[in-house]
Each structure stands twice: as structure tokens, then as C-alpha cells.
Amino acid sequence: MSYMELSRTRPVAAAWENLTDAQNEKQTTAIYEIIGNHGGDVKAVTFSPSHNALTSVIEYPDQLSAMTTVAEILALGTLEYVEIEQLWDVVEFTGLVRSAAAKK
């Protein structure tokens, strides 16, 4: 079973100010490389105006992979995490609910 995570992040302003396009691309690539190095598969990256943050949905092989990714991205000093939430597969969860109800 994989581990699906929703995260909201904000750029650390000082890390992104006055960058050339090449420097910006290098920092962005570093983030995606960390995700990939831990088996992460980016499903979506959007901007959430109501949270004033980037919202990402990433699938990982397990929770440890997700946690290690967050730690390494924080170490870059380019993003801060506002919120991290585990997402449950609705079909899988519904099956668990039905199974629990059948045991009654």
C-alpha cells in the first residue's frame, strides 16, 4: 500500500530573491530530485489562493519515504511546510468500513 500525502508549502523568500532563471530552475530541480530519490510520484502541484501556498499531492512508497523527503527539502532552506496531511484512498477506506460493519 502506498502513502499519499497532501502538503502546503511556501517559498522561503530570501532563498528565491534575485535569482536568474537558471538558478531558479536549479533550486526547483533539487526539490523534484529529492522527491524522486525517495520514490515519490508528484500527482499535482497547484497554488491555493485561500491558503496562499503551493498545494502538492505526492504518492510515496511509505510514510518513512515521505518523512525523509520533507526533512531533506527543509534542509535545502527553500521551502517551509505549512501543513502536511495523509490522504486515504476512498475505495480502500470504504472497503475497511464495510468489513468492520460486517463483523458486527
Describe these PLM feature segments.
Residues M1-G36, D41-N52, S65, V90-K104:
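Short S/T/G/P-rich N-terminal loop/turn motif that feeds into the first structured element of a domain
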Residues E5-S7, S56, I84:
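A structural signal for short, well-ordered beta-strand segments
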Residues A53-E59:
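Short cationic amphipathic helices and targeting signals
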Residues E59-V91:
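An amphipathic, aromatic/His-enriched active-site/gating alpha helix that lines ligand/cofactor pockets
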